[in-house]
């Protein structure tokens, strides 16, 4: 498993004590959450302690999301969660710092987001409902579809101009990553199929999920963002430390570096 081998090597060679924070980036439906869970399990088999977080955990509260949308009425991408600008970046920074520095035997509460709240518009759960993570840890996997994206010099899509500007705030996350793993789609349209499949599996399991048409419509909103920001990520990882790029075929399996 190249991802586990890469992550364990980065952990073994990390220059400072404390947990390795691995940034895991990849398009929607590519298997980030599954891989993150596999890495946590793999470290467990090695007798090491690990947990995984998602950028989704630190989405804005619903009232903050509404305020953002009202602030930029001409930018429909801010009507709902997802794009750069819809996360509490400072909350994410504090969370990563806490997991890295808390005293042994203590616990850190991790934000939790309820995507079903407000008829599917979503809201952050109250602090008392946040799960606790026991520390110290050896590995923190921090995953997200737009993790590692950096501002484009000249965004060609005016609808993404403000989101591009918001990306500058996310540098504080990159500064806390000790290694970076990029799952890249070999073809852009794979992303659409992956999301449709994911929603289909969710429905088949008995959970609420988008129809095929709804899932395709939803994910196509993000394709311009991938086109704008992914090329730079391919050329230049967001950190100076160890990084690995895995190109995925339509079956989500690596086809090459």
Regions found by a protein language model. Give the residues of each.
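Extended hydrophobic secondary-structure segments that form protein cores and membrane-embedded regions
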Residues: 21-26, 52-55, 180-182, 245-247
